[in-house]
Amino acid sequence: GSEMCIRDRGISVVLCVLYVLARVRILIPEKKHLAVGSHLYWELFSQSISMGLMSSIVSAGSVVLQYGINGLGTLTIAGHTAARKLFAFTDMPLISMANAGSTFVSQNRGANQPDRVRRGMRQMYLYSVVVMVAAVVLMSFGAEWMVQLISGSTEPIVLENGARYLLWNAPFYAVLGVLLCTRYALQSLGQKVLPLFSSVIELVGKVIFVLVFIPKFQYNAVILCEPIIWCFMTAYLVAVYLHEPFVFPKK
């Protein structure tokens, strides 16, 4: 139960502390490590504000898109909800790589190793393509079955729309992976404002789709909304990355 879980975690903490004290004393902070200047505080504060604003804008875009979906009927909403849950699960490899990549980039920024950043980004982009291929194969064989499993529905509209959402989105996983890796990498390189613009592109794109395309093309527009926006965002972010002075210094 919960008591056992808490006890196990407590034991893990004690063992980790003992191991650090015995074998990895370099991780123990000293007095000199606690002396930080105002520059570091400002850097952390401004970066957190940038990331917070980006998340807020992304959430606002999701609310706008949901407003457009709500007028398409309960069965369409049910299929879309199931598909989004599956999408949130299948894009975890991309999000995990982007998070790991941001740490890798920031460490090599501190170590002044731009060549390692370039090589790491290329490998992350290739990884995104591999995830895309796996997603396409998975959705081609199991999209409708997975929607039925998640939704618990046998309604043809629910299964068809949910499966179509997954099938049409899967080929764009490579674009999404490049988008996430590049945006997180730019933030790790100290870029605060330029990555924020990508979220503005997303918000504006979703507003346009809700006002113009969804009323005309119905759920097809909902399916293509995010993949098309991802393409614009990725093009912008990659252009910013290719002009990043640390990664690509002018000779």
Question: What role is predicted for each listed range?
Answer:
Residues 79-143, 176-190, 194-198:
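Small-residue-rich hydrophobic transmembrane alpha-helices
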Residues 51, 55, 63, 67, ...:
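Transmembrane alpha-helix boundary and packing residues in multipass membrane permease domains
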